[in-house]
Amino acid sequence: MLPTLVLVGRPNVGKSTLFNRLTGTRDALVHDLPGMTRDRHYGRGRIGGKPYLVVDTGGLEPVVKDGILAEMARQTLQAIDEADAIIFMVDARAGVTPQDKVIADRLRRVTSPVLLAVNKAEGMNRAVVTAEFHELGLGEPLAISGAHGDGIADLVAEALAPFPEEEEASDDFGVPKIALVGRPNVGKSTLVNALVGAERVIAFDQPGTTRDSIYVDFERGGKPYVLIDTAGVRRRGKVFETVEKFSVIKTLQAIEDANVVVLVLDARENISEQDAHLAGFVLETGRALVVAINKWDGLSAEQRDDVKRDIGRKLAFLDFARFNYISALKAKGLENLLKDIEAAHAAAFIKLSTPKLTRVLEMAVEQHAPPKNGLFRPKPRYAHQGGKNPPVIVLHGNALEGLRDDYKRYLESSFRKAFKLQGTPLRIQIKEDEGKNPFEGKKRAPLSESEATRMRRKKRVRRKVYGAD
């Protein structure tokens, strides 16, 4: 599983700015008002051969007993307990504050490594600016600037030092490894029990990690599956005696480790921002996806229409996924759900031959040629498969850097229809390996003496005829 870095610190020390720097995005809301990051935000990053997850917490205000700031602090404490490494951020310009001391006291009791990052240190002497932060007792402070990127590479390298480089992804078709994800109380626990059944549970902690994610082997209809259970710890013989809890870190890790993700939604609740964030993260990781709308029973026809409209409006970017309307409690719709899981798994690991891909590409171009972009019209010539889980299709041709996004979506749709790639994201990559100017980037060779003489002679003639160079 990918290591998880958790950013903690009091409000307004620059956690969201560092998050954006580490993930190359601007997903976290950045504002100068304390408390603007209300929920934990999460993303992926990479340094060298090491990918990682980043969780940006709300500001930790230990003195607040209730209200939204107390809820932010509670979520932060949960993230601290589950992190692989913690980056504790302080403000170089504000110095050590009483809140910093309280947070440091809490962090000294955790088992995960803690790195002390002194942010907003741009233009300042590093030795001087970090000196007073030694009193926090968290090791050597590291001066950084999230806004300017100073010291960020060293910070991340130190945080990831204990973790190995990413292993090459397997292309094996294997058994569907399913992660059920979703907000609390949408029915994940009930769905786990409905799918597995008490008599078939084989639960064990994943080796090599400190997580309490549970892997459950089960069979259904004679077919084997592996379920990654994020709904709560399940011990042998106590499958039904659990309280569902939501853990962002375990959920993100499960998505990374799965090859099919089932996003569970509550039909009686509107689609939330958290639902959309989870769906977007699944899309970003490239995992096959099936959506299960639970608690469908008991809704009127009018209510069902409202739910479908809400889904169509807020999850339109999941047009590749299949949607299942189920009742986990009454075990309705589960067979179709498993069929769609199988289909999504097969699509994610499909083998696509170069001749067939090229034939589909040629037919798509013949029906609708790429529009010109500037002086040249892009000319896709052939395609081959560049990866699985998700499938990657690499296009070759001339002037392909001019392919517009809408035309790439058209090609993606053509490939999906031809190969029935339902349930998995599809990546289109461009390889500009033909039709380039062979002299691009090369300097003109200096003129020989005779060439220079002829050039001067031509210039003299032009002056006599035209009166200028």
Curated annotation (Swiss-Prot):
Residues 432-469 are annotated as: Disordered. GTP 1 binds at residues 9-16, 56-60, 119-122. Residues 432-443 have a biased composition (Basic and acidic residues). Residues 455-469 have a biased composition (Basic residues). It comes from the Bacteria. Residues 350-436 form the KH-like domain. Keywords: GTP-binding, Nucleotide-binding, Repeat, Ribosome biogenesis. GO terms for biological process: ribosome biogenesis. Belongs to the TRAFAC class TrmE-Era-EngA-EngB-Septin-like GTPase superfamily. EngA (Der) GTPase family. This is GTPase Der.
